[in-house]
Amino acid sequence: MSLTTALTYALPHRLLSSMARSLAYSDDPRVSRWLIDTVTRKFNVNLDEAANPDPRSYATFNQFFTRALKPGARVADADPRSLVMPADGRISQLGRIEAGRIFQAKGQSFTAAELLGSDEDAKPYNDGLYATVYLSPRDYHRVHMPWTGTLRETVHVPGRLFSVGPAAVNGVPRLFARNERLVCHFDTSFGPMVSVMVGALLVSGVETVWSGEEIPAYGDRITRKDYRGQGIQLERFAEMARFNYGSTVIVLLPPGVAEFAPQLGAESPVQLGQALAKLR
């Protein structure tokens, strides 16, 4: 085990994340301005494409971090049969779910059942497709719909809060199936679709457009919310949720419905709205 991986295990994840949350929501201008200036400089954040490009106008760091983009900064792929990329970031991995397993990194994988919280939830995705998108601190942190879908259920799976940076992904076995996450099940024109919002070290929350804050509160058991019959439909490219700090979103598709855009591969930089896959 490398020193970096050992430190990843040793860090007090929840304490650090709780502290990060307090700082992110602080309206003390000395705190918010220092955090905004530090992150903007360190990660070369492009504020020109923000709906509000003035860093001094954000009352808290969290307002800055979850900032909206100006109209037209991202557009959906013109092909109406394209499923679109759900977020800005980088492809961590993508491919086929083989024997129920999802590839994480060299020598590392986890099962779809572990990720989703049950064998039953994973069955529709056997031999289907997965795409894992990592959002770095410099990226736009709202997650959008790859395809039009009606919300069926969410599953809050408690877990750890390991970093989801490249070193941790390479060094921590089954990382995405161990971190706290919100599994969002949708019914679409081609069948079921899942978007999984994975929490991480210093992630101070996940919010959805239909329910507000979902993570925290931190729990000790799997919590399901049934939305069937409530008519919560989100259009292709519409905002679905947001991270209150950088993390990862994983999209699962059932078998036989789509093929990934050929230019995509591990480590590909991606933007919200570009083609992720095309329906067959």
UniProtKB/Swiss-Prot annotation:
Cell compartments where the protein resides: Cell membrane
Entry-annotated residues carrying Pyruvic acid (Ser): S247
Record's catalysed reaction(s): a 1,2-diacyl-sn-glycero-3-phospho-L-serine + H(+) = a 1,2-diacyl-sn-glycero-3-phosphoethanolamine + CO2
Record-level GO cellular component terms: plasma membrane
EC number: 4.1.1.65
An MF annotation (GO) of this entry: phosphatidylserine decarboxylase activity
Post-translational note: Is synthesized initially as an inactive proenzyme. Formation of the active enzyme involves a self-maturation process in which the active site pyruvoyl group is generated from an internal serine residue via an autocatalytic post-translational modification. Two non-identical subunits are generated from the proenzyme in this reaction, and the pyruvate is formed at the N-terminus of the alpha chain, which is derived from the carboxyl end of the proenzyme.
Main location: membrane
Marked site positions, Cleavage (non-hydrolytic): G246, S247
A Gene Ontology biological process term: phosphatidylethanolamine biosynthetic process
Record keyword Disulfide bond present: no
Complex and partners: Heterodimer of a large membrane-associated beta subunit and a small pyruvoyl-containing alpha subunit.
Cross-referenced HAMAP family: PS_decarb_PSD_B_type1
Similarity annotation: Belongs to the phosphatidylserine decarboxylase family. PSD-B subfamily. Prokaryotic type I sub-subfamily.
Protein's UniProt name: Phosphatidylserine decarboxylase proenzyme
Organism of provenance: Stenotrophomonas maltophilia (strain R551-3)
Gene: psd
